[in-house]
């Protein structure tokens, strides 16, 4: 067994706020004011989205470098959604400054479904991916 990632959170004085440490990095987590927090940092579901989009960006850049492909500047955005019936899903959107061929478009969508964090989340969360 290998530890892939590690993080620790310690409570702050303010309700819902915590100081997160992950490796050399430290940041604050909190809830939105509308949920009783002070919105001093990302909320837990924000971290799920952040992990997914960070892994997507890194994986696509690694793939492009390995294949000698120029993807140019692009962004990845994600929303965590839930409905009254209890269904949860993530909508992931990629936006490229340059025009992609249909072949590149399909390959990118395929790669997105194979990123390490995507695979982890797919074991318990449905993920919808689109390029906008």
Regions found by a protein language model. Give the residues of each.
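Alpha-helical metal-binding/catalytic segments enriched in His/Glu/Asp
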Residues: 52-56
């Amino acid at each position: 067994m290998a530890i892939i990632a590690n993080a620790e959170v310690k409570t702050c004085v303010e309700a819902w706020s915590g100081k997160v440490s992950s490796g050399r990095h430290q940041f604050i987590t909190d809830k939105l004011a509308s949920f009783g927090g002070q919105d001093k940092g990302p909320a837990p579901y924000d971290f799920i989205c952040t992990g997914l989009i960070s892994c997507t960006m890194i994986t696509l850049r690694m793939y492009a470098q390995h294949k000698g492909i120029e993807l140019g500047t692009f962004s990845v955005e994600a929303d965590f959604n839930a409905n009254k019936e209890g269904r949860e899903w993530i909508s992931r959107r990629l936006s490229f400054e340059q025009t992609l061929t249909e072949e590149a478009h399909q390959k990118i969508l395929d790669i997105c479904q194979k990123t390490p964090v995507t695979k982890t989340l797919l074991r318990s969360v449905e993920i919808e991916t689109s390029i906008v």
